[in-house]
């Protein structure tokens, strides 16, 4: 029965790609060659490729072996458990030792010879994979041994007590019989102030302490704050106002100047001296501007010296403006005098 897998070569023989030739066929090739048969005839007779026959015969003539594989076999393993043990010992004695120093020590101590000593890369791989974790574990164990036993954690802000009114009220309520008592810190959340709050920095009692003055707790911060009196602060001179000399303030008030172009602050006009607003006269919608400008707008004190009431910035305006359809109205219109305004 032919095998279920395989290929047929050019001579009609069956072979499996990637697998060596069976030892029986190899031995038969060597026997036929010793009988003086040419390799080409052996190839045709056994239906094996000519290259395979030539390679088997060449290896047999060189090494005397018909077995497949590399000539001389693979390199023996050099990283034996004994070598790894010595490498670990060297590393524990000197954690900063290099791989090439370990290699020299293996040769000096007679653990290996020049034929089976591991290479520097092999020693580095052993240090990284096999000894690295053990060294870290050893350092961790030694660190734990030298560490002192941890002390029980103190409660937050144990020096200054800040009982909250909720906790104080809960402590006054009696527990009914048959029900286990629950600590105040578990039953009611306590409002612990921040250690960096303004009240803690200044030494002032918090609001919760002011509410629960009847609490049996006592805070030394109250004593510290009460000890600070007015005597501890620098006294202010009687002639000083807010840290400034009174004479300086009076001098500034005496020689104070108002801004340029604006009236002084104290120059106010009383309401009784002001005349009421005049009643506007009825003016025709077709009034023209032929009248004098002073008849419509009163002058102001802040106008330019060479300007007119209608042109405060010394801009010339034509005397009259002509509009279509308003010529007749101009003749019939009456001018409004200044007394009418």
UniProtKB/Swiss-Prot annotation:
Region (PAI subdomain): 7-63
Segments of this protein annotated with the region RED subdomain: 82-130
PROSITE patterns in UniProt: PAIRED_1, PAIRED_2
Recorded superkingdom: Eukaryota
InterPro entries xref list: Homeodomain-like_sf (IPR009057), PAIRED_DNA-bd_dom (IPR043182), Paired_dom (IPR001523), PAX_fam (IPR043565), WH-like_DNA-bd_sf (IPR036388)
One family name in Pfam for this protein: PAX
Record bears the keyword Cytoplasm: no
Biological process (GO), any one: regulation of transcription by RNA polymerase II
CC per GO annotation: nucleus
DNA-binding region(s), residue ranges: 4-130
Major place of residence: nucleus
Localization annotation: Nucleus
Keyword entries, A-Z: Developmental protein, DNA-binding, Nucleus, Paired box, Transcription, Transcription regulation
Molecular function per GO: DNA-binding transcription factor activity, RNA polymerase II-specific; RNA polymerase II cis-regulatory region sequence-specific DNA binding
Region (Interaction with KDM5B): 168-189
Quaternary data: Interacts with KDM5B.
Job of this protein: Transcription factor required for normal development of thymus, parathyroid glands, ultimobranchial bodies, teeth, skeletal elements of skull and larynx as well as distal limbs.
Protein name: Paired box protein Pax-9
